[in-house]
Amino acid sequence: SMPKFNKENILVEVYNLILDSETTDTERKELVIFKDEVEKGLDFDNALMKLADHLRLIGLDNVLKHRSMSKKVNKFYMKINSVGQFKKNFGIYFPPMF
């Protein structure tokens, strides 16, 4: 079933990534936007989905520029990544058919 993420745990993780010196400015910008939106009371799942999508775009851009995502942000992205793709496409999670 859909991974359900704990809001407080995710926020703590995001705060730590924002403060981490290895986090790039581009990554940090997206993390700060997410943090601000959640603190303003925006829907957590939607904000997380948007963050996953934006980190995915950063990842694709990095590939084109032969850069890599900072290690901890990449690990965090891998964890939340599943939420964006499935929820957006179907509203519910369907396991891949292959």
Where are these regions (language model features)?
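Short terminal alpha-helical segments
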Residues: 1-32, 95
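Non-catalytic, well-ordered alpha-helical scaffold segments
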Residues: 8, 12, 28-32, 45-49, ...
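Residues in soluble alpha-helical coiled-coils and helical-bundle/repeat scaffolds
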Residues: 19-22, 39, 43, 85
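Amphipathic alpha-helical segments that form the core helices of the histone-fold
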Residues: 31-40
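Intrinsic-disorder/low-complexity, polar/charged segments
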Residues: 40-44, 95-98
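Short, charged early-sequence alpha-helical segments and their helix-coil boundaries
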Residues: 42-76
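Amphipathic alpha-helical binding modules
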Residues: 64-98
